[in-house]
Amino acid sequence: MTPTQLKDQSPFGATHYDIEQGKPVYYKINNLGYTMRFDGKMWYICHGAMIQNYRTL
């Protein structure tokens, strides 16, 4: 996928992404400072994840 395709397909609020098993996984920081992960349906809190380790959109 190109960066433009990744950005176009990203959910609202996503700021970072990673490729896992050939599919993009999106991340964001919520208003309390927790890293949130999007699995295609919902945002989940991702404990121990460092947002700096993921690529920016």
Model-identified regions with their sequence ranges:
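Structural boundary micro-motifs
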Residues: 1-57
